[in-house]
């Protein structure tokens, strides 16, 4: 195993409150406050369009995506923070020589901005978003293209995420997969190769050679 790919929301960072805040402002601007859900976290993971489609259903309009992005870009890191142990885990993996990358369904620019503000971007060899390659997870394309840029084969890679989209993308790309149980965890049909209760479990997984190097 030479490269580890990370999802962003619900894996590296807890961004639920800021996403909920942007959604609240969006619905208020559109006069659709009554559609604000009780639990925003269950809609996170597929990107802005998917979030709004699930929340608004037949009331969704394409132009609402930009309204949400406007509000989110204004304040992307009010409450957002890395999960406990994430900085330690990234530091430990980097010191062991692993290539690290972020494969998010968020916009690339926004993903980079958030990681910069949180002082995490320096750990990663590559950061890509849902708009980088024209396809989002669960498509395997973002995973395969990221590995291609890094010069690595899928068999030498592990993807860590908290949703079906992450696990399916990894499996379709031919990587090993690990479910981040500390995240928003939306797993239905996909079965990961590994489950991680806390970020530091990933370091132990590598140290114990459970995954062949």
UniProtKB/Swiss-Prot annotation:
Gene Ontology CC terms, in alphabetical order: cytosol
Pathway involvement of the protein, from the record: Organic acid metabolism; glycolate biosynthesis; glycolate from 2-phosphoglycolate: step 1/1
Enzyme class, UniProt record, top EC level: hydrolase
Classification via Pfam families: HAD_2
Record's keyword terms, sorted: Carbohydrate metabolism, Hydrolase, Magnesium, Metal-binding
Ligand binding (Mg(2+)): 7, 9, 162
GO molecular function, one term: phosphoglycolate phosphatase activity
Transmembrane segments: none
Cofactor(s) of this protein: Mg(2+)
Keyword check for Cell inner membrane: no
Active site: 7
InterPro entries linked to this entry: HAD-like_hydrolase_sf, HAD-like_sf, HAD-SF_hydro_IA, HAD_2, HAD_sf, PGP-like_dom2, PGPase_prok
Binding site for substrate: 38-39, 43
Family from the record: Belongs to the HAD-like hydrolase superfamily. CbbY/CbbZ/Gph/YieH family.
Protein name (database record): Phosphoglycolate phosphatase
UniProt organism field: Aquifex aeolicus (strain VF5)
